[in-house]
């Protein structure tokens, strides 16, 4: 039994839709963050919120506490 034209057309249309949707998906790369140790933060970094506030005074948008050896230091973050 040969496939009908309607069946072949439907299969072709379905295949075309699948190919078109795959072509439309693109992966968005996440922005890289650069870290720089804060020059103004004093003492051990316990709160990333306090670190971020100090980093904002240094013209960075954000900051976080990171382990540096045995001590925790404040590192300021920005998009590279």
Curated annotation (Swiss-Prot):
Gene Ontology biological process: cellular detoxification of cadmium ion; defense response
Chain's gene name: CAL1
CC annotations in GO: extracellular space
Upregulation: Induced by cadmium in roots. Down-regulated by cold stress.
Tissue note: Expressed preferentially in root exodermis and xylem parenchyma cells in vasculature of root and flag leaf sheath.
PROSITE patterns hit by this protein: GAMMA_THIONIN
Protein name according to UniProt: Defensin-like protein CAL1
First-listed, main subcellular location of the protein, grouped into a coarse class: secreted
Domain of life of the organism encoding this protein: Eukaryota
